[in-house]
């Protein structure tokens, strides 16, 4: 999509959200190399970097780190941010929009389940649904944090 927009001289931007566990897949790096080769500065990838995937910690499954250095080696503009800081994320979006000549990746360091005591940093919640009582507790904890 980003390449098509570039060819069509479109001002549209493409946003791609990735999980850190996804970065263990080869096709992600093929796409990263292609995006850099074609200087797709209309492409912004955001990596949700919480170090957890369905099978556990990413470094125990198939360690994709250091993510920032890998993207730099592939020719990307790399920004790192606290993924829970909305103002900092918005600043990164603006910086990415103004960066020319290469795609940008924002590595958003996050905590899986942040703000919910029984979910925080727990890989088991990756593909699980809370029951009714857990939903009520989670909503209560989130509302209290606001």
Where are these regions (language model features)?
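Glycine-rich ThDP/TPP pyrophosphate-binding loop and its adjacent helix/strand module
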Residues: 1-146
